Design a protein with these regions (language model features):
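Conserved alpha-helical substructure of the radical SAM core
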Residues: 3-125, 132
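Conserved AdoMet/S-adenosylmethionine-binding subsite of the radical SAM
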Residues: 90-194
Length: 194
């Protein structure tokens, strides 16, 4: 077996492809198949915790300092700062502070931003996400029936709202949509490919 050494850790930090922040464990949906949902027992309880900028600033500063040394072996590496949840758009204040801070740093590498989202709040924040060039991974399990496990906290389907927000994004920002938007689906008994 290969031992992890300080040099191995340093090499991996210098060549980091992605930094992912769990922005919040809170979600505005209650998907039936979620690991926090009704089909599972013995899971961690969601506590509606929100990540604060003050908690991630030291990490960002450390990585920036490290990446700006001459130790990096790549001419212009690309690193994604990714936002995940729960539903990350529920903590948009954190996302904006983090993105604004990173953009002000003089980091010697290409920085991109990405997010996995259920798109329920996309209508509120799409202008900002487009302006910052976010790469979006939108969770959608298919048509209305295929997406029927993805419900809000009252048990109502999220499908209509998500589709409306996705179509609005596609209509208002067609190039962004073509270049920066992908979809993530959970295969299950209502949408699985046979």
């Amino acid at each position: 077996t290969k031992r992890v050494t300080g040099d191995t850790i340093l090499y991996n930090l210098l060549n980091l492809k992605q930094v992912t922040f769990e922005v919040t464990d809170e979600c505005n949906l209650k998907c039936k198949y979620c690991g926090f949902g009704e089909m599972y027992t013995g899971y961690d309880i969601r506590e509606a915790k929100y990540l604060s900028f003050n908690n991630v600033k030291p990490l960002i500063d450390y990585l920036c300092e490290l990446w700006n040394t001459n130790l990096s072996d790549s001419s212009l590496p690309i690193t994604f700062f990714s936002f995940y949840g729960g539903e990350p758009l529920l903590n948009m204040d954190f996302i904006k502070k983090t993105v604004d801070y990173i953009e002000k740093l003089n980091i010697r590498r290409k920085i991109l931003f990405s997010m996995t989202t259920n798109a329920m709040l996309l209508d509120r924040y799409m202008d900002y996400l487009v302006e910052k060039g976010f790469h979006l991974l939108i969770s959608l399990d298919g048509d209305r029936y295929g997406d029927s496990y993805r419900v809000d906290k009252c048990g109502h389907s999220s499908f209509e709202r998500v589709i409306r927000n996705v179509k609005r994004l596609q209509t208002n920002f067609p190039k962004f949509f073509a270049d920066n938007v992908n979809f993530n689906s959970v295969l299950h008994n209502r949408n699985s490919v046979q």
